Amino acid sequence: MAWTSTLPAHLLNLIKNSKYVHVATCSKDCIPSVALMNYIYVPGEKLFGQTDNKNDYIIFVSPQDTQKFYNIKENPKVALLFHDWIIANNLSVGKESISGTPTPTSIPHEEQRQSELLNLLQELNQAELNQMSASIGGETEIVNPESEESKYYKDLILKANPDAKAFIFEKNTAVVKVRIDNARVSNNENRTMFLSKGKS
């Protein structure tokens, strides 16, 4: 059984089912970069042509002419951010601006806030809102773009993200596999837990 089975159930569900992940990379000169990516979660037993019973993987497609890809080639260590916080547009519902810049709308302030709050409450399933985030540490492997393995993973990513077909099968892209090595989990009460293969 993969060590990731020790992760909180909600977090594991979040990793398996979210549409996007923030991918943080770093060059050999320690210059960081971050990108928002479509991805899939692949259990070790469903890897192409092999079985890994101890690890699970995050897999995404990247253009080969990006800083992110250059960084991965130079430094295979990456960090991945998953979260279920309220989306950024809705976070402003409970926050007052200190910039002094007027809001570009003719709707009265209080009425606008009530409308935003109503929309927010309509969108949220309170039973599902756990407000948890996790930074996943892992090591990458670039898959040969001409291989059957690459096609296998691209097909899986397409199945999960059909709206990204043009990007997934764009020329000069490559599949990147990230082995999940550790996780730092935080919630909205600033409680943090660290889990890794050695501590599972």
Swiss-Prot record:
Keywords, ordered alphabetically: Cytoplasm, Flavoprotein, FMN, Nucleus
Cofactor(s) required for function per UniProt: FMN
Assigned GO CC terms: cytoplasm; nucleus
InterPro entries assigned: PMP_oxidase-like, Pyridox_Oxase_N, Split_barrel_FMN-bd
Cofactor note: Binds 1 FMN per subunit.
Binding site for FMN: 60, 68, 125
Pfam families: PNPOx_N
Coiled coil: none
Localization: Cytoplasm; Nucleus
Membership in a protein family: Belongs to the pyridoxamine 5'-phosphate oxidase family.
General remark: Present with 358 molecules/cell in log phase SD medium.
Protein name as it appears in the record: Pyridoxamine 5'-phosphate oxidase homolog
Organism encoding this protein: Saccharomyces cerevisiae (strain ATCC 204508 / S288c) (Baker's yeast)
